[in-house]
From Swiss-Prot:
Its cofactor is Mg(2+); Mn(2+). It comes from Geotalea daltonii (strain DSM 22248 / JCM 15807 / FRC-32) (Geobacter daltonii). HAMAP family: DXP_reductoisom. It catalyses: 2-C-methyl-D-erythritol 4-phosphate + NADP(+) = 1-deoxy-D-xylulose 5-phosphate + NADPH + H(+). Pathway: Isoprenoid biosynthesis; isopentenyl diphosphate biosynthesis via DXP pathway; isopentenyl diphosphate from 1-deoxy-D-xylulose 5-phosphate: step 1/6. GO terms for biological process: isopentenyl diphosphate biosynthetic process, methylerythritol 4-phosphate pathway involved in terpenoid biosynthetic process. The keyword Kinase does not apply. Its EC number is 1.1.1.267. NADPH binds at T10, G11, S12, I13, G36, N38, N122, E124, G203. This is 1-deoxy-D-xylulose 5-phosphate reductoisomerase. Catalyzes the NADPH-dependent rearrangement and reduction of 1-deoxy-D-xylulose-5-phosphate (DXP) to 2-C-methyl-D-erythritol 4-phosphate (MEP). Keywords: Isoprene biosynthesis, Manganese, Metal-binding, NADP, Oxidoreductase. The gene is dxr. PANTHER family: 1-DEOXY-D-XYLULOSE 5-PHOSPHATE REDUCTOISOMERASE, 1-DEOXY-D-XYLULOSE 5-PHOSPHATE REDUCTOISOMERASE, CHLOROPLASTIC.
Amino acid sequence: MKNLTILGSTGSIGVSTLEIVAAHPEKFKIIALTAGENIDLLKEQIDAFAPQLVAVKNEELALKLEGMLSCRKTAVMYGVEGMIAAATASDTNMVVAAIVGAAGLLPTSAAIEAGKDIALANKETLVTAGRLIMDMVKTRGVKLYPVDSEHSAVFQSLQGHRKEDVRRIILTASGGPFLNLSGEKLAQVTVKDALNHPNWSMGQKITIDSASMMNKGLEVIEASWLFDMPAEKISVNIHPQSIIHSMVEYNDGCVMAQMGIPDMKAPIAYALTYPGRVPTGVKPLDLTTLSGLTFFNPDVVRFPALQLAYRAMKDGESMPTVMNAANEVAVAAFLSGRIKFTDIARSIEKTMDLHHPRSLSSIEDVIEIDQWGRERCSELLQSF
């Protein structure tokens, strides 16, 4: 029996995780849940899974939720303190880190410090504080399992093989909804257009990141930390069908690939049950029904965000933290209609140009640099 805390239970990953938990009650028990503002869905989850503790964004929402719970014995907390309490709950032995963005850093790092195994869906944790987090993982002796479909695919393709035999990691990308649009048309796309992903059902922020290809850039950085692999040994292939989720090429010329229908329940379940597997309800893959699988290199002129991620890795130190902070600010500005889609990468690059990388020796340093990046990007956007 695994006792779980889910950080971000009302988001796409959180909801899918709870579907797996509900299908296998003999394997999982929910100890704590956290959410932002969607307390109506959180109330349904409390009724279904009876957690000991839940945490929400602020005190106002916490009071409102308490009023909705009547005689439930679930404790309600709020803010960062509440998130950390959920992440470090004494009965929890695995934390599903599914909070979107840099907001997931503090509770995830607290969970690691408390000795909890991690199922990591929050890629920004490793993007912003990769060295610090991986050092904590080693020091505390915890297990960190990837939930992202691409990193799960790499993890599965590495099983039974030696790291020193790896020639390169190949992350696949669908290309998003704007794969074939010209640069001129990219400047005219709407929020509605950008949120219409062809293959995956995801939250708003990650869907926009997928459209800009920043999501793949973040995944390159995450893969570098997860698998201790330099950037030059991590490639990206556009694969519009999203059937092969990623590959590992070995020095003998063999390539191991993980395939499946695009459904996040599969990598979530693998992270929760490794090295075992459980039925997930994911539709079986029938290769005979596919017209073909195609692969090609990304267009970094039309989608410069991917190259910005490689630049951030090359610059190192605090630059990925600044890049991520600027991206979160720019995506929020696009979603609110304040900037054009093509302004996202432009504003990130300008923010990075203002930054001189410095070493990060603590999570507090990461938070300070993250704030710097947000402030600089916000200032830049005023002139767009």
